[in-house]
Amino acid sequence: MAKVGKTIEHPVTGERITFLETAASTDGTLLKMAFEMRPRAFIAGAHAHPRQEERFAVGSGRIRVKTGGREWIADEGDEISVPRGAGHTWGNPFDEPAQVVVELRPALRAETYFETYFGLARDGRVSARNGLPSLLQFALMLHEYRDEFAGPPPLGAPGAVLAAILSPLARARGYRARYGTYEDPDGP
């Protein structure tokens, strides 16, 4: 579990996250993170949070958010909320860095997902092209964290079925949905 103040980095996407509030510090109410994004940073693939609302507050720079067929350019001081279950994508395609505070409500296990995903990247276990782990690792993580992350409607259901089918194979091949080495050794 992440601790307040812990910072993790994804060397391929150029994202840096500092945990401002965690599941433990808020009794599960929210996960609050400061994202630092380099110019023209990797744009997150379309996804949804089946049981979480996501909020973005731009501290500096700007980001692009797409959801429900609409696109917003959010500048410094702007805030955007994406309702639970809504497919969306977001990132920094611009020429300047961006700092964004992201909240997920409730927290669920999203911090463990981020610790695992960024830890895999730090250890060179993701694609240098797109920053994603192997198909089996990704399928296992999507299945394990299906309350936190899913493909956007209408792709979410087939993706969830495929992840469920591939998860036993991934485990048999030695993949895990979380690795203790990526989590804070002192706990919450």
Each predicted region: which residue ranges?
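Jelly-roll (double-stranded beta-helix
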Residues: 1-30, 41-46, 50-52, 57, ...
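Short amphipathic
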Residues: 32-36
